[in-house]
Amino acid sequence: ISTTLILLPFGALLEKIAIAILPDKAVPVKDADQWFEGLMASKHHLGISTIAINQIHDEIKGMLATAAENVSQSFKAVEEGASEGIQAIADREEEIDLSNMRLSQKISKILVLDQTPKDIDTLNRMYTILGNIERIGDHAMNLAEYAETIEAKGLQFSNYAKKEFAVMEETCREGMELLKAAAAGDTQSPLSEVAEIEQRIDDITR
């Protein structure tokens, strides 16, 4: 449904819909955001979309790097214990969530401008990539919390659980590699495979 809405040619309507579905939560304004707002306020729209899309590509790469760090640290907490706590992981998870909101808002604003079919496709892929990064980040956070609970109760993972975590770690890394390629602008990177990977992770964690 969301993809169909994005393809509608009614920019003003799309922006209202996007604002309605985005979380009603204050988002910190960064220097890059101020630059973006200035760019969008320009009356010279020629080339603005390309510049804005390139900026968002860079920010998505940063968001992906943060998620990759959380994946790595979460599995480290499982393997070595969470005796030092998981606050750093939680802080990065919040950063990922905020980045997702900020970038989603930026994309909705770009879509208000007249777009080429290529730009529309690029922006649609960006929405998909953002959602995938956030979901993998959620998996990492849940895993870290699980490891912390096990640590607090003085329990240990069974050999079977360790094998499952090893499979899950490899699956997460596979998904991150696909997202890395997609975030770099590889239009051939099959995002449908990322969805399948997320489903495999869900199956393991049930």
Role assignments for model-derived ranges:
Residues 1-206:
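Cytosolic, long alpha-helical scaffolding segments
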